[in-house]
Amino acid sequence: MDADFLIIGGGIAGVSAAARMSELGGVIVLEAEDALAHHASGRSAALFEPRYGAPAVVGLSMASEAYFRSLPGVLSPRGLLLVGKAEGAEAFEHDLEVMAFDRISVEEARGIVPILNPETVTMVGYAGHAEDVDTDLLVQGFAREAKGRGAKSVTRARVTGIAKEGAGWRVSSSAGEFTARMLVNAAG
């Protein structure tokens, strides 16, 4: 076997998995493009709002918060507005409470986003705790961590075939053949 773990996809999911799995054994990341995080992971305007989303997402966000805060420069202040119409008051009130937003006036909100239409927007919440995520810094940090533990990244490795082979996997790619005990699909 070439590695314990073979990860297909070199975006944030694949590179962060490589960082963690490299603590447990040998890792190879296969990325189809010329560089890691070439697609959405490298271009996203990421928001860290740990109370937003489905319960599983909120749980993951809350569990990740201390780690994100330990990385200098990964998080920076942003703020987030939640806007609502009169007919959506019940859902708005629920979201305001669950996500711990502060209620602000429409006039205050227009001071932040002047194009808000006060004829349409009747309720506003503000979350000063919402932050930007420097995704490039985060991905590069995970990549350094994985590389520091011996993980290898292979770019220009478009996967062309996958086969279960004995107790592991064989992956064919434009960069050659790779084998591993475990296969992780982190491709976008």
Which residues does each PLM region occupy?
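A short, glycine/Asx- and small/polar-enriched loop/turn
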Residues: 88, 113-121, 163-170, 178
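Dinucleotide-binding Rossmann-like beta1-alpha1 core, especially the glycine-rich loop
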Residues: 45-115, 121-123
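Helical element adjacent to the flavin cofactor pocket in flavoenzyme catalytic cores
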Residues: 126-182, 186
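Glycine-rich FAD pyrophosphate-binding loop
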Residues: 22-41
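Glycine-rich Rossmann-fold phosphate-binding loop(s) that bind the pyrophosphate
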Residues: 9-11, 15, 32
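Extreme N-terminal leader/targeting segments of oxidoreductases
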Residues: 1-5, 22-24
